[in-house]
């Protein structure tokens, strides 16, 4: 497995894309980005479902690791946005120029997905710990001078 062996590919090599259509069911693992009032947010649906029409949907081709696709799109989208956004909206035809850094090896993709999931778990644990400590601080400060209530 060689993690440094990646190449730049066009989004159309790994998935199709379209402006989301109302009431259309999209497959699990599809990624989406905003076209209206666009920001750097990239979403992914975990189960088959509908997506609002203000989004562009990336529908993965057969055999594509959808978790890896989400990571690749998330990492490449801010750079693409800086280059191609001309107003607060993004034009659907410009999305065809979207390029991804892509690892061809399935083993490398699986390794990256596993590593990113572990990092995300650590982030969530740390955020939960911070929240618990904030609540603990609030409790202790609230009870610091009990006679002053």
Describe the predicted segments one by one.
Residues 1-20, 27, 104-107, 125, ...:
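Non-catalytic DNA-recognition/assembly elements of restriction-modification systems
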Residues 2-6, 56-63, 79-80, 90-114, ...:
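Proline-centric
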Residues 29-31:
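Structural motif
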Residues 34-76, 85, 91, 95:
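A short beta-sheet element
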Residues 77-80, 121:
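A common structural junction motif
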Residues 87-90, 124-128:
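Alpha-helical membrane-embedding segments
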Residues 112-123:
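Hydrophobic structural patches
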